[in-house]
């Protein structure tokens, strides 16, 4: 897809996680999307491969690629096989923009052997109809789009953050913002 795309990172630093994934209702100055992923390859009902990693937007002048496109490029070039079923799970700091949502939906329509679940910390420009339509297009392709809850943040902390064995420390407002965002997502998907 795009030869300039970097390979995924293994993890991110704690400060990056707390800044980028905090589920604020209004998240000013968070201009990047971070995407943590797991990929399970399944053959004959057994998990045959397991990949994890982290992508972020590449905003240099050569690639200018959103995190979702970085993942798709890497996945298509290095992982995807027509003889394997895949369960892919994303944990994202922002929900996809309309262009990325459309590209992911088109990819899934062409690859029925790939199932995708997206857990997102925040909804990107959820008040605009085209962003809502992007999320609906993903849902129509069978993608489960969910808002990250405490357990999802904790999972990310334990699996995608250089945490030095420190426990996840939830921030004030996590549960309240989760409920507000979950309701807003439900409204957007109708």
Swiss-Prot record:
One term of GO molecular function: cytidine deaminase activity
UniProt GO cellular component terms: cytoplasm; nucleus; P-body
GO BP term, pick one: DNA cytosine deamination
Induction: Up-regulated by IFN-alpha.
InterPro entries in the cross-refs: APOBEC/CMP_deaminase_Zn-bd, APOBEC_Cyt_Deaminase, CMP_dCMP_dom, Cytidine_deaminase-like
Domain of life: Eukaryota
Cofactor needs: Zn(2+)
One Pfam family recorded for the sequence: NAD2
Active site per UniProt: 68 (proton donor)
Transmembrane segments: none
EC numbers on record: 3.5.4.38
Tissues with expression: Expressed in spleen, testes, peripherical blood lymphocytes, heart, thymus, prostate and ovary.
Phenotype when changing residue 106 to K: Resistant to HIV-1 Vif and reduces Vif binding
Nucleus as UniProt keyword: yes
Regulation: (Microbial infection) Antiviral activity is neutralized by the HIV-1 virion infectivity factor (Vif), that prevents its incorporation into progeny HIV-1 virions by both inhibiting its translation and/or by inducing its ubiquitination and subsequent degradation by the 26S proteasome.
Residue segments, region (Microbial infection) Required for interaction with human foamy virus protein Bet: 40-86
Domain CMP/dCMP-type deaminase: 29-138
Catalysed reaction equations from the record: a 2'-deoxycytidine in single-stranded DNA + H2O + H(+) = a 2'-deoxyuridine in single-stranded DNA + NH4(+)
Subunit composition and interactions: Homodimer. Interacts with TRIB3. Interacts with AGO2.
Protein name (record): DNA dC->dU-editing enzyme APOBEC-3C
Organism name: Homo sapiens
């Amino acid at each position: 897809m795009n030869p300039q795309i970097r390979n995924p990172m293994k993890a991110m630093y704690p400060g990056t996680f707390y800044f980028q994934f905090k589920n604020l209702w209004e998240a000013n100055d968070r201009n990047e999307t971070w995407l943590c992923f797991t990929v399970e390859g399944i053959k004959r009902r057994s998990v045959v491969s397991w990949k994890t990693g982290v992508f972020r937007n590449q905003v240099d002048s050569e690639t200018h690629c959103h995190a979702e496109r970085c993942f798709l490029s890497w996945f298509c070039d290095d992982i995807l096989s027509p003889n394997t079923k895949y369960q892919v799970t994303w944990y994202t700091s922002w929900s996809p923009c309309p262009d990325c949502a459309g590209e992911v939906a088109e990819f899934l329509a062409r690859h029925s052997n790939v199932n995708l679940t997206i857990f997102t910390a925040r909804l990107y420009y959820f008040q605009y109809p085209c962003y809502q339509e992007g999320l609906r297009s993903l849902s129509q392709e069978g993608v489960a789009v969910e808002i990250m809850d405490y357990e999802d943040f904790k999972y990310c902390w334990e699996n995608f953050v250089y945490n030095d064995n420190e426990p996840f420390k939830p921030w004030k407002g996590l549960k309240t913002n989760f409920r507000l965002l979950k309701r807003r997502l439900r409204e957007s998907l109708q």
